[in-house]
């Protein structure tokens, strides 16, 4: 394999200047998603986008199946009788709920699920009898509905979240449930690593935790414009839901005890984060393991006399790659120029492009271009499969490395309100000294003019031996670093 062109990746100026406008352009031009459906916050997955989504769903399913989770499917309707039982939960979600206001002649009051804790617990009560039935780990990938009143954005802020993976687990005690929380964090790390996403892990402040949770752990990523996006959450629910639904089990000592539960979710926001994180002004770059098409072959010929032999050679190349288990497509459209095809497939994020022309046929070689760097390589047909496998690994490693470098460069610390404000204006995630007091935390985020992500769990959250004061409540000694950012 011979390098014949050095790296010259596309710029990111347009993406950084107006990320949402760029994202709309990408979804439209790359034929991933259509935003023109006439209901606010509800969008259409196009065939190419659906193929990408299916690969992500397969990753999510595999990651859960391998760790003892079982897939289920619950109805979209939740009786209000169930939904209204957990007081914190209904207070947190009531403003976002879609109500079924009429259904034939029946007057039953129903909710379109915003999340499924109140749907699943009544059934778990019927299934769990004694400690031998636990732990129980369930998950489903479904649509959930939120009556968003804020501005909606494709994949990012929706009224119908159509790829909501929610896991719900039931345990004998807090210790086992919190062990499950830690496992859920590891599952999510594996998923996001395969998506080549960099992430922060933050314990949400109490005022921003999931409604009905004891605590919430969130995965946040930083997008190229400096705003953060929540891409996954893990909740320890304690006995808040099992108490109101009377989910108990017979313990080994013969006593009946309340079960402890967790829940954790991922949605199509993770796909949005992947498309944007790996995007540039020419389109996006898809991680090879998730790309609908891993290799696109572009035959280059001039005139009818070259076409037959070059296309025949392209099909030979395709056969070799397909037999090696790769997802391959030949673009032999006669009405499009090679340059147009290069632009089109770069836009759609195909990781590798293989060019074959008359000279390549004569030399029994191909030219391979990496989408992430635009480096070109001449590769002999005999080493083609190994070269493509190696380049796909290299592309994946490079996407992951770039994402982590970008994220780490965004996180800074500030010990004054003015310094924190300046960092936010520069598109940074800023860590500021905080006492842990909720009122002080709310005041602090308002002083800085940012959102609170919470206390970092991926680094030392303690201020250590430094005598730092809470930036909002100077009379209180700081105990933690509190992460702040602008976020979607």
UniProtKB/Swiss-Prot annotation:
Record GO cellular component, one term: cytoplasm
Lineage of origin: Archaea, Thermoproteota, Thermoprotei, Thermoproteales, Thermoproteaceae
Catalytic activity: tRNA(Pro) + L-proline + ATP = L-prolyl-tRNA(Pro) + AMP + diphosphate
Organism of this sequence: Pyrobaculum arsenaticum (strain DSM 13514 / JCM 11321 / PZ6)
EC top class, as a word: ligase
Its EC number(s): 6.1.1.15
Subunit structure: Homodimer.
UniProt family annotation: Belongs to the class-II aminoacyl-tRNA synthetase family. ProS type 3 subfamily.
Gene expressing this chain: proS
Functional note: Catalyzes the attachment of proline to tRNA(Pro) in a two-step reaction: proline is first activated by ATP to form Pro-AMP and then transferred to the acceptor end of tRNA(Pro).
PANTHER family the UniProt entry points to: BIFUNCTIONAL GLUTAMATE_PROLINE--TRNA LIGASE, PROLYL-TRNA SYNTHETASE
GO BP, sorted A to Z: prolyl-tRNA aminoacylation
Keyword Nucleotide-binding: yes
Disulfide bonds: none
NCBIfam families: proS_fam_I
Record bears the keyword Ligase: yes
Domain comment as written in the entry: Consists of three domains: the N-terminal catalytic domain, the anticodon-binding domain and the C-terminal extension.
Protein name: Proline--tRNA ligase
GO molecular function: ATP binding; proline-tRNA ligase activity
InterPro entries hit by this protein: aa-tRNA-synt_IIb, aa-tRNA-synth_II, aa-tRNA-synth_II/BPL/LPL, Anticodon-bd, Anticodon-bd_dom_sf, Pro-tRNA-ligase_IIa, Pro-tRNA-ligase_IIa_arc-type, Pro-tRNA_ligase_II_C
Compartments in which it is found: Cytoplasm
Keywords: Aminoacyl-tRNA synthetase, ATP-binding, Cytoplasm, Ligase, Nucleotide-binding, Protein biosynthesis
Pfam families: HGTP_anticodon, ProRS-C_1, tRNA-synt_2b
